[in-house]
Each structure stands twice: as C-alpha cells, then as structure tokens.
Amino acid sequence: MKKLLLIAGRPSHALGAHEYRAGMLLLAQCLKAVPGLEVDVHDEGWLSSDDALEGASAVAIFADGGVRHPLLEADHLATLSTLVDERGLGFGLMHYAVELPEGDGARRVDAWIGGHYKDQVSCNPIWEARVEQLPEHPVARGVTSFATTDEWYFDIQF
C-alpha cells in the first residue's frame, strides 16, 4: 500500500481563488478509487502531526508560495529534506507552491522537482479559455465544450 500525503495551504485568497483545502479534498476524492493507494489530506499548511510521515510514499503541497511557503516555516524544509534525499520520498508542488524565494528552499526544490517559479523572471498570466471543439482521442472521451479562467505558469527556472 502506498501512502500519499496532500498538504493544503492556509486560506489566503478570496473565495473561488486558490482554494487549497477544497482542491486537495477534490483530488483525494478522485484518487480514492486507485487500488493500493491511501490518501491523507492535511490542511492549515502542514501535517496534523509529524507521525503522518510514517510510511509515506509521497507528499504534495498546494499552498501559497513566496515568503509564505509552508516549507519555509519551522523545520519543515529540514524534515522533508531528510526524507526526500535519504529515503526517496516522492515530492510534488502544485500551482503557487512552485514559487520559492532564492535560497536553500529554492535550491532543494530544484534538486527534487527540477525547477521553480522565480519572482520577476517567471510569468503567470490569467486568461479565459474557451474550448469549443476537442479532438477525437480517448483522453477526451466524454468531455464537452467548456470555458474556464486559467492561470498558468511559464518560464520556470531550471
């Protein structure tokens, strides 16, 4: 059995924007049918207890980035560094959580996931996506036209 820890950041934006807890709960709901996978959601920016890491296969963080990044609080970076570097714990960051200020946190994240969003260099435009036609492909089966507001990141620093 694999154990995935989903860490949702503290509320920080208006309703409907950067809904960290709701996003992680939705992701957990989608993953609960995966055979051999246990998913635990932790909110308020970190694990409910350090014991949660016991037996964990991977950690994913969906939270504010920059100076409010959960990895920069308390001993969080050191705790995960030991597990990622020495035990091979899987690690992922979602959306705003890929932004870290320059320093040890950014260097470690670069080593773990290959890069990070760098303030004043990377970009994150917001656009209205309107998808009217989808290709005939198995991955698009059952998907109909839709519109959404999308914020995407590019020029990530590797």
Label every model-predicted segment.
Residues P35-V39, Y117, A147:
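Secondary-structure boundary/capping signal
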